[in-house]
Design a protein with these regions (language model features):
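Short, glycine-/Ser/Thr-/acidic-enriched flexible segments
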Residues: 19, 38-39, 108, 168, ...
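Short, hydrophobic/aliphatic alpha-helical segments
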Residues: 1-10, 162-167, 240-244
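Iron-sulfur-cluster electron-transfer modules
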Residues: 1-96, 102-119, 248, 291-330
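Short acidic beta-strand-loop surface patches of small beta-rich interaction domains
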Residues: 78-82, 195-220
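Ferredoxin-type iron-sulfur electron-transfer modules in oxidoreductases and energy-metabolism complexes
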Residues: 229-251, 261, 267-330
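Hydrophobic alpha-helical positions that pack around
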Residues: 71-74, 79-181, 187-192, 199-201
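Active-site loop ensemble at the mouth of alpha/beta enzyme cores that anchors a bound cofactor
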Residues: 108-138, 210-242
Length: 330
């Protein structure tokens, strides 16, 4: 009954991936983990939801745990989210719910599903595997509230999102799906022609870099934030680099320091991810005919989660290992 209601309501992952929730919940696991870490900077949506509806979140976690048969139910968020932690802990105590709050250190990408599973359980999801393989299901806190609505017969037809960045007053908006982002930007007082937008956060968000593109973009089930920045911002300049230019930069400037590999979150939980090897040979990727040699240099790119830590933090030369991994993955 519950799974079917979630399917009929059209619930998908609200945290960005958009995976059908009824499929994800159709398993039996030990852990149910609610992702409230708000992985990227300059996003406020998940924190807002935790403050506004802590009891609804906690009570729905209990209902979901009954579907999953989970014995350990965890809401994971960063340890400096003091107001959100207090609200959730008060709700857990009031409802006497079998749920605990897991306080994570403030690191990026704390909200990455597999990094979170490792932090909470100590288990590493197999490369290109699913959390259920290690007895876990992870859902975003926004997804949990969509499930709460679904169990009451309400389909997913609205979305909470934050508007942040270079705006006079960052705000939360509650809008119908399909709302043009232009209408939201106008409501936020954003002057036309002077700003571009990132759907999501500065690390993994999708850039919208023309007035026409802004006019043609609407709110979907996975839209969680509109990050407004000046058109000449570094993030937009970087996003405009062509693949040939980035390949040329990799060939000429990569010093093979391995920092992109050593600081890769997936590498740190034991996955085979070696962006330094991709950077070393991406210029000749189309020339490699031997399958074993190709796998040696480029096979690990399939394990990249595209978090961007390598190009925004790790690389001392300002190169783009993440983009090169994405290019190799096709």
């Amino acid at each position: 009954m519950g799974i079917e209601a979630i399917k009929e309501a059209g619930v998908v992952g609200a945290g960005g991936a958009g995976f059908p929730t009824h499929v994800k919940l159709n398993v039996k696991v030990e852990y149910f983990i609610v992702n409230a870490a708000e992985c990227e900077p300059l996003i406020e949506t998940d924190k807002f939801l935790c403050r506004q509806w802590p009891e609804r979140i906690v009570s729905t976690v209990v209902k979901i745990s009954e579907m999953l048969g989970s014995t350990k139910n965890v809401i994971a968020l960063k340890d400096h989210y003091h107001r959100e932690i207090q609200a959730l802990e008060d709700a857990i105590q009031k409802l006497d719910a079998p749920v605990e709050v897991f306080k994570m250190s403030s690191f990026y990408p704390a909200g990455d599903e597999q990094s979170m599973i490792y932090e909470v359980t100590g288990r590493s999801v197999p490369e290109r595997g699913l959390p259920s393989q290690v007895g876990c299901v992870v859902d975003n806190v926004g997804t949990v509230l969509s499930i709460a609505d679904a169990l009451e017969g309400k389909p997913v037809c609205e979305k909470y999102l934050s508007v942040t960045g270079d705006v006079k007053q960052p705000k939360m908006y509650h809008v119908p799906l399909g709302t043009p982002i232009r209408a939201i930007l106008d409501a936020a007082g954003v002057q036309r022609g002077t700003y571009n937008v990132i759907l999501g956060g500065p690390m993994m968000g999708k850039t919208v870099m023309s007035e026409e593109a802004i006019d043609n973009t609407v709110v979907t089930k996975t839209t969680g934030n509109l990050l407004v920045l000046p058109k000449d911002h570094y993030l937009f300049r970087r996003a405009s680099y062509s693949i040939p230019k980035m390949i040329h930069q990799a060939r000429s400037a990569c010093i093979q320091c391995k920092m992109c590999t050593d600081l890769c979150p997936r590498h740190l939980i034991g996955h085979d991810v070696k962006p330094n090897l991709v950077m070393r040979s991406v210029w000749r990727e189309e020339q490699i005919e031997d399958n074993d040699e190709y796998i040696k240099y480029f096979g690990s790119a399939a394990n990249c989660c595209s978090c961007g830590a390598c190009e925004m933090f790790s690389c001392p030369m300002g190169l783009s290992p993440r983009k090169m991994n994405d290019y190799v993955k096709g």
